[in-house]
A protein has these predicted regions:
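N-terminal leader/auxiliary helical segments
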Residues: 1-197
């Protein structure tokens, strides 16, 4: 899952949102440096990632990107899932997505003193380029694919990922539809468990 999905699977809890979004930027024991609510978000993110990687729909979606991108295929699928979530009118109208994106940026701003250095350096671009909302558009996904390729070793072209998304759009959307209800149920249960710990 990518930024939008992790924010969505934080169930409106401010510290969970922050922890869920910064988790990939927090290594090892550094998670113990954060308040309990943010730590729970970090742990929830990692549990969601494990669930995502093992889900049959994700394995099916990754197969579409495997030949061109091998180990990075899961990262492309994470972005694709955010696209389908942003465009899922059963979850977000355009206005609801706008409000959700703005609310998420506001929570990150409010908790700015807890953002790890690398996330804090990236966050102004996320907000100014409106990543969370623009996942709704194919051009927004193309920007994300290009960013992924820029940051990755051994990759220099994202055009094949766009070709896969456009040519396999229906199959990939079916993977999303088979996956999202399951991950939402899993994340809700896990979030409740973490709240009780």
């Amino acid at each position: 899952m990518n930024f939008l999905a992790h924010a969505y699977l934080s169930f409106g809890d401010p510290e969970t949102i922050v922890g869920n979004l910064i988790s990939d930027f927090v290594k090892g024991r550094a998670q113990n440096d954060f308040p309990q609510g943010i730590r729970k978000g970090i742990r929830l993110h990692r549990d969601i990632d494990r669930f995502t990687d093992l889900h049959p729909a994700t394995r099916e979606a990754k197969a579409h990107f495997q030949q061109a991108y091998r180990l990075y295929s899961s990262a492309f699928v994470d972005i694709v899932y955010d696209h389908f979530l942003a465009a899922d009118t059963d979850i977000f109208t355009e206005d609801a997505l706008r409000a959700f994106a703005d609310g998420t940026y506001a929570e990150l701003d409010r908790h700015g003193h807890w953002l790890p250095q690398r996330f804090a350096a990236m966050f102004p671009y996320m907000k100014s380029q409106d990543w969370l909302f623009n996942y709704r558009h194919l051009w927004g996904i193309e920007m994300s694919f290009k960013g992924l390729v820029r940051r990755a070793a051994y990759m220099d072209d994202s055009s094949e990922a766009m070709r896969v998304l456009e040519s396999r759009h229906g199959e990939l959307q079916d993977c999303y539809r088979g996956f999202m209800p399951d991950v939402k149920n899993f994340a809700r249960r896990r979030w409740e468990e973490l709240k009780d710990e």
